[in-house]
Amino acid sequence: MLKRKPSNVSEKEKHQKPKRSSSFGNFDRFRNNSLSKPDDSTEAHEGDPTNGSGEQSKTSNNGGGLGKKMRAISWTMKKKVGKKYIKALSEEKDEEDGENAHPYRNSDPVIGTHTEKVSLKASDSMDSLYSGQSSSSGITSCSDGTSNRDSFRLDDDGPYSGPFCGRARVHTDFTPSPYDTDSLKIKKGDIIDIICKTPMGMWTGMLNNKVGNFKFIYVDVISEEEAAPKKIKANRRSNSKKSKTLQEFLERIHLQEYTSTLLLNGYETLEDLKDIKESHLIELNIENPDDRRRLLSAAENFLEEEIIQEQENEPEPLSLSSDISLNKSQLDDCPRDSGCYISSGNSDNGKEDLESENLSDMVHKIIITEPSD
């Protein structure tokens, strides 16, 4: 019988078995060395000619070298990132505490990993603290912010200039508690400009350029009829000297800024102000209610002054009225006169005529009364 020759495959397998064991042994040895010395492992592997026989041993060595290179690169990147992070933390601590940061040594990989873990834990704890503070202080900051906004508005804004819905005179003193900052301190005789009236009884007003609350039971509301004569009297005093032009008239009542608007809208003379009304002033964009009242009251006073001057320019009827008032007592003492003038010659005939008229009247009355009986 013929004997078959052994194939090349079987021969290769016999020769490759020790090579595989040696390659795996070298791989384990290099892996253990890489844990202790990661930086020198690549150089030792590249310069170590242990496996110089066969193509398959070269491919296995190349694969192991790539894995070691990747591990070495990852270690170096971790070191660099850890160093940068530690430097950033140290700089922040130096800025906060004003102390010099202690240098860290990261030459050993174990120390580097330990510092990385510590820094990561510290950063996580700091982030959690900051987030907790922000979340817990969110509600309080909102509430404090609103109160601070209100206080800033009261402090920064100027005095309230209107609108007002009336005026009130205080008849009872009231001093609020020191904790009540919204209420007004009022005294008897103070006049408060009312801003708002609420059905609860707490009104809002302004006193001495301060806006606050007060109870309606401490005040008496001043009607417009009571307030109007006071303004008219003041304007009469200011207009004691008659103004001739519109500009002089407005300067006397301290409203000269409205001269241009009045002149442009047809109010050129003082006579044009006779028929002016509040609606006309609103159409002229005079928004301040106090200015409108002053202008209207001044125009009314100007008309009254003209009427008084016209009466003074007519002395005869005034003198007659005075004479009549003086001689009234004398006229009451005199007998009444019929208005007919009777001469002395015809006095007897006049008496007879009067008697005949009286007789005829009496007869007529008697005739009328008889049938009624």
Curated annotation (Swiss-Prot):
Reported induction: Up-regulated in peripheral blood B-cells by IL4, IL13 and by CD40 stimulation.
Cellular component terms per the entry's GO annotation: cytoplasm; cytosol; nucleus; ruffle
Modified residues (Phosphoserine): S23, S34, S74, S90, S119
InterPro entries, alphabetized: SAM, SAM-SH3_domain_protein, SAM/pointed_sf, SAMSN1_SAM, SH3-like_dom_sf, SH3_domain, SPIDER
Motif Important for interaction with 14-3-3 proteins location, chain numbering: 20-25
Polar residues composition bias: residue spans: 50-61
Domain SAM: 241-305
Phosphotyrosine modification, residue list: Y160
SUPFAM superfamilies per the UniProt record, alphabetical: SAM/Pointed domain (SSF47769), SH3-domain (SSF50044)
Comp. bias regions, Basic and acidic residues: 37-48
Record keyword Cell division present: no
GO BP term, pick one: negative regulation of peptidyl-tyrosine phosphorylation
Keywords: Cell projection, Cytoplasm, Nucleus, Phosphoprotein, SH3 domain
Highest taxon listed in the record's lineage: Eukaryota
Protein source organism: Homo sapiens (Human)
This protein's name: SAM domain-containing protein SAMSN-1
CDD domains membership: SAM_SAMSN1
